Amino acid sequence: MYKEINCRRIVPGIGTGKALVTKDVINFLAMVDTKSATIIDRNHELFGRSIKDIVLVFPNAVGSSVGAYAIYSLRINQVTPAAIICMNNADIITASGCAISDIPLVDMLEKLSSFILESEMEISVNADKEVVTIKTV
C-alpha cells in the first residue's frame, strides 16, 4: 500500500530510498563528513549515520552559505542523499546546495498531521510532479 503526499518542488528531480528522519537541524559544513556522508556531530540525533543514498528528512539547515558547498562536496565525492525533504520551509543553504548538486528537494508536505514519517520507510520523492510517495505496511 502506498500513501501520496503533495509537496512543493524546490529542486526538480526524482529520488527514492529509505528515509532517514531527524527533528534536529543540520549544519552541513560542521556536522557532515563530506567524504563519507556521515554525521560527525556527537550531539546530533543522527551521529554516526550516513546520509548517502537515502531520503533525508529534516527541518532545515543552519550555518553559513558555505554549507551549500559542503552539499556540493557530497556530489563530488558521490555520496549524496537520493533526495531531501525539508519539514520546514526549505532554507537557502539547502536549496542552493541541492540545486548545484542535482539533488531533488521538496518542502511543505501536506497531510502530515495524520501521518508521521519515520526512518527506514521507503520513500519516493518526485519533485517534478510535486508528490512524495510512502510505502506503508
Positions of the model-derived regions?
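Feature captures the catalytic cores and cofactor-binding loops of soluble hydro-lyases/lyases
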Residues: E4-G13, L20-V131
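Short beta-strand-to-coil "C-cap" segments at the C-terminal boundary of structured domains/repeats
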Residues: T133-V137
